[in-house]
Amino acid sequence: MDDYKRILITKILKNEVTEALGCTEVGLIGYAVSLCNISDPFSIEKIELTLNNGSFKNAYAVGVPNTKKYGILPAVVGGLLGDHKNKLLVFNGIKYSQKLEDFIKERLKIRVINSPLYCGVKIKDNSGNTFESLIKDNHLNVVIPKINNKLISEINGSEKEEYKNLELLDFLEYIDEIPEEIIQLVEKTIYTNNNLIKGDFLNFGNDCLSNMVNKTTSACNTRMIGENMPAMSVAKSGNMGIMATLPIIAYDYSNEQNQEKLIKSILLSVLVTIYATYKSSYLSSMCGCVSKGGMGAVIGLCYYKNGKNIKKLDSAARTFTANLPGIICDGGKVGCALKLASGCFAAYSSLFVDISYENGIVGKNFKECVENISEISKIMGDLDSDIVKIMSKKEI
């Protein structure tokens, strides 16, 4: 592998594999609010929060760490109490205030737009000062932090387009000689996500597939109820990080318990998950944890079982594509664990069946499969507005 590709992949990994506390969309809201640096939250006269459909869905009914609350309002309040330097760990160490929640509730206006990832905050205080922040396109891409219309800083995006042009062979070459800093990152990812397993969400037994389902769903449930425990997110999604890692961790536990093979397989899964995300989008009407994290998991599992066998890897991608893509995303919630259970079954069964190119949207190889799923994901984009309308009718 040439040096440029290796440097590019390493940079992407360091940007896209990060700790997140709670569902990444409530973390996104909290981070955006915290960027406004409000010294006295009780001075706020009004606060306007603008979210794209996907961010609204994922924050609507999910637990917010250190609040014992669910949804968008406590995420805003938590952001006012948090430190922007913590980014997606913004709720770390906050002391929640019910009094502040009651105060903000009367002053918060939420607007939902049809857009790629977008979280904008506008705050006006009782002295006439205005504070703004805008995060768009990815969860850490801060575009506008302003005080009284003065730009504080601006951060540009990454080499996403170049990464999208890489091939599966590039990822396989990269994991042959992994930089030490990335080995440490993968080890941290394994430890952090494994630590999320708390009891049983679904307990089907002790065979390999059951262990995959048990561990993956338990970790997902821990995140979705808002436990004060970080996950290592992949492509800015904690659940996608769980789907891309825990099925492989469980498979290794039930089979060889080979640390070197586990690290390579996890890393390959993560690289594929990021690739699939860049080919489509961070958020969409299609469940990314299953369609993107699941594709990562199946490629990682197939590598663990069969090594660098392109024929087998293409076969696994085809079989996975014939199964689960198309599952809708109706927001972050406890029910996400059930979707990840389906993802585990689809990934595992893809190791043993070869579905041919003639079936439905199945591509000839891994790359075509990812591109076809991405195309379906983009076509499904208009569904988000309808999903949000249905969710907004609820009183919770």
From Swiss-Prot:
Its EC number is 4.4.1.28. This is L-cysteine desulfidase. Its cofactor is [4Fe-4S] cluster. [4Fe-4S] cluster binds at residues 287, 329, 336. Belongs to the L-cysteine desulfidase family. Binds 1 [4Fe-4S] cluster per subunit. Homotrimer. GO terms for molecular function: 4 iron, 4 sulfur cluster binding; L-cysteine desulfhydrase activity; metal ion binding. Keywords: 4Fe-4S, Iron, Iron-sulfur, Lyase, Metal-binding. The keyword Lipid metabolism does not apply. Catalyzes the cleavage of L-cysteine to form 2-aminoprop-2-enoate and sulfide. The former then spontaneously hydrolyzes to pyruvate and NH(3). May be responsible for the production of sulfide required for the biosynthesis of iron-sulfur centers in this archaea. It is an enzyme of class 4 (lyase). The active site is at 23 (proton acceptor). The keyword Manganese does not apply. Pfam families: SDH_alpha. One of its GO terms (biological process) is L-cysteine catabolic process to pyruvate. It catalyses: L-cysteine + H2O = hydrogen sulfide + pyruvate + NH4(+) + H(+). It comes from Methanococcus maripaludis (strain DSM 14266 / JCM 13030 / NBRC 101832 / S2 / LL).
